[in-house]
Structures are given as structure tokens and as C-alpha cells.
Amino acid sequence: MKVNKVELLEALEKVKPGLANKELIEQSTSFAFIGDRVVTYNDEISVSHPVKGLENMKGAIKAKTLYEFLARVKDEEIEIEQEENEVLIKTGRSKAGLRFEHEIRLPLEEVGEVGKWKKLPEDFVDALRLSYPACASDMSRPILTCVNIRGDKVEASDSFQIIQYRLKKKMPADFLIPASSVKELIKYDILEISLGENWVHFRTPEGTIFSCRTVEGEFPDVERFLDIEGDEFTFPGDMKEALNRANVFAKKETDVSTIPTVKVKVKNGELILTAQNEYGWFEERLKTGHKDAKFSFSIGIEFLISLFDRLKTCKISDNKIGFAGDSWKHVIAIMSEDEE
């Protein structure tokens, strides 16, 4: 079978988020080829994408070996032959045999059948991108590790901050989705949704289907915390550049699941940014036009960087700070002096 290598690599790239880091579930570190699609599954996420030229191939191949080999092949077209216990790939003067498992042992039946597709609100991905950094990482309160989708609202909170985004249209269904899944989902141009039993499915124009587990439970009512009456504070004009420098030290290589944060402290007419990771620390002091302002808070640094493309001010009350745009609100608890 002659196959376009570039198209095959693109298909494999699309489904990589469904791979597991360790094979706790059999074949969860493999690409499964089923008919005209390639599929991955890791118990939390399953992704499938169309593949051309391999419609008659059914089985699983170790993902790392296949992907890394194809990435090093220079020819645009390759030949793939399915033999008894291996797949033979020929390209130019090279050929490689990869172990091939004919039986698909991934528990894909858990994902369930995909029902009728419904159109998503056009700002749904923007809402997810804005909201998920506010989710908790502490699994002692699993509901707060999720983004809450309810009606025309997309909400997230770690109990220290709350984000609520108002969609232009109501969602076809209500559900809770883990922030870890959202982090991958927002990389796709999803336009349609189908809600199943314990799983929700999204589809792109190219035919990628991204499925992820939903979480059972009730998200807390955050509405009463979102309105703030207080003084307006204007951030320094050079703050975004300072945040970009701080971001180098906010990212933790040993814990990539943790959202990088920065601490913001305002006192005596200065705004002080601090960030720290396992390799070093950062501090920068900026002048403000608010000599009497005194507060501090911690926030996801990439959210704050993106925020300065939208607005440069916030409102300060006795115990919280509020940011607001046309369709969203973000409230953060002010840290006490003991917490500082």
C-alpha cells in the first residue's frame, strides 16, 4: 500500500493526546488502526482521525517507534505492507519492520457510540482557553479540577479565584470536563459536539473526533462572588514585558501538570512581580501611579499575559480583585499578610 507520509504523520500528530505516558492499559501507548481511522485511548481521552491508504489494516503499533521513524523519513511517499506479526515500511533504500498486534485490546467500547452532532457556540474554545487555568490541581476536591459548562456559562474555580465566561449561545448540553482534557482540547478547531454516557465528543472540520470523560457532580454556585465594588487600579504600561521575563522562571519542568503562576504585590507605589521554579527565581519592580494601593495575589502567568491584550485595569475591594471583559469576569482573593 502506497501512503503519503506527510498525511500519515499529520494524522498521528492529531491523535497523540490520547496516548498514555505509561502502559497501565494494554495498547494505550500504541496507535490503533481501525478501518479508515487511527485511534488512541488513555482512559481519560480518546482521539481518532481519518487515514488514507490504510483502510484494510486493523491492529496496533507502538506509537513512539512508528512516529519517530516516519519523522526521520525524507520521502513523501512510503510503502506499507501488513504481514503476519509485523508491518513492513519501505522508503528509498531503507526498510523497517514494526511489531504489529492484530487484536485491538483497547477498551474503546467504554467511549460509547457517538450520537447526533450539534453545533458549538463560536466562542466556546475561547471560553475554555480563558477558564481552565483557574481550575484546581488538588484532587481532594475533584469538582474544582474541572471546567463547568452550564447553559451559556463556562466556569472554573480553585476556591481562590473564579472565572465565568458568558457564551453567545447556550450549549447543547451541561457537563463537567477535567482541566487536563481541556488543555489538549483547545488545540483543536472543534465545531461540533455530541454528549454520550460519561463521555463527551467533539469534531473538527477535518474529521478529528476528540472524546473525553466527563465528571459527575455539582459545581458550586459562584454567581454571588463575581460582582465587585471598589477602586480602579491601572497596571504599569511595561508590565506585559516584565511578565514575559517572569514566565521563564514560572514554568516547572518537573511538574508540567501545574499551571505556572506569578505573584503580584503592590505596595508603596511599586508593583513587584516574583516567580520561582526548581532552577531559579525572578523579581522585578515597576512604578505605579497608585501610592496608597496595597494588595497581593497569585495568578496563572500566561492568563495574566494574555489579559493585557484585552484590558489594563482591575477593581480592588477589601478582600478580592476583579477583572472583567465584555463576556467574562475573573475574581481573585487578595492574600493576607500571613500568606505573603
What are these language model-derived features?
Residues M1-E340:
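Structural preference for solvent-exposed beta-strand-turn elements
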